[in-house]
Amino acid sequence: MNQTLETGTTTVGITLTDAVIMATERRVTMENFIMHKNGKKLFQIDTYTGMTIAGLVGDAQVLVRYMKAELELYRLQRRVNMPIEAVATLLSNMLNQVKYMPYMVQLLVGGIDTSPHVFSIDAAGGSVEDIYASTGSGSPFVYGVLESQYNEKLSIDEGVDLVIRAISAAKQRDSASGGMIDVAVITKKDGYVQLPTEQIEARIKKLGLIL
């Protein structure tokens, strides 16, 4: 059943001087029907690595499980975490191998090793690194916010507010995006940390945005 569900999704990842911040909203849609109001689209796949999903839910969930297993095996065998660029390459190669019967997904991989990284990966395995990236039907609205307000020297606190504003802008204009916002901060010190919903709600109110 999940293989038939498409997420009209908005996801975003940004790099800062010493962190990566990733965020998504929660609405899951099938054409014009809201199938789920609390879908999970933001995942920790390694100690210092996160992944967001957009596209067919079943395809995306399989890829998340696969990546978690591969990265855990790598860590157990080598006693180090896989570099973020290698994570993106592994996922890219896997998708490219099945490009004629593709996983219908758009993915972001973000994390920190010697420096922060965000990669956008398409269904054919195309992988592009950038200082920020967004996927899903709401991404044009996210890019509008990021183009005008992003600065890599933002503090982590300012970066969290920025991704919340970006996702909120998409929710206002994209009918396939909605619900609560999930945010994760990835640093060398603390690894992957997903912020509590209560903290996100408080920030949304402080910024004068609509829940």
Curated annotation (Swiss-Prot):
Task: List, from the UniProt record, the residues annotated as the active site of this protein.
Answer: T9
Its activity is regulated as follows:
The formation of the proteasomal ATPase PAN-20S proteasome complex, via the docking of the C-termini of PAN into the intersubunit pockets in the alpha-rings, triggers opening of the gate for substrate entry. Interconversion between the open-gate and close-gate conformations leads to a dynamic regulation of the 20S proteasome proteolysis activity.
For this chain, one GO molecular function annotation is: threonine-type endopeptidase activity
**Localisation per UniProt entry:** Cytoplasm
Q: What is its EC number?
A: 3.4.25.1
Q: Which reaction does it catalyse?
A: Cleavage of peptide bonds with very broad specificity
Among InterPro entries, the record links this protein to: Ntn_hydrolases_N, Pept_T1A_Psome_bsu_arc, Pept_T1A_subB, Proteasome_bsu_CS, Proteasome_sua/b, Proteasome_suB-type
**What Pfam families does the record point to?**
Proteasome (PF00227)
Question: Major location, coarse class?
Answer: cytoplasm
**GO terms under cellular component:** cytoplasm; proteasome core complex, beta-subunit complex
- GO BP: proteasomal protein catabolic process
Q: Does the keyword Phosphoprotein apply?
A: no
Q: How does it assemble?
A: The 20S proteasome core is composed of 14 alpha and 14 beta subunits that assemble into four stacked heptameric rings, resulting in a barrel-shaped structure. The two inner rings, each composed of seven catalytic beta subunits, are sandwiched by two outer rings, each composed of seven alpha subunits. The catalytic chamber with the active sites is on the inside of the barrel. Has a gated structure, the ends of the cylinder being occluded by the N-termini of the alpha-subunits. Is capped at one or both ends by the proteasome regulatory ATPase, PAN.
The similarity comment for this entry is: Belongs to the peptidase T1B family.
Q: What does this protein do?
A: Component of the proteasome core, a large protease complex with broad specificity involved in protein degradation.
PANTHER family per the UniProt record, alphabetical = ATP-DEPENDENT PROTEASE SUBUNIT HSLV, METALLOPROTEASE TLDD
* Name by which UniProt lists this protein: Proteasome subunit beta
Q: From the UniProt record, report the name of the gene that encodes this protein.
A: psmB
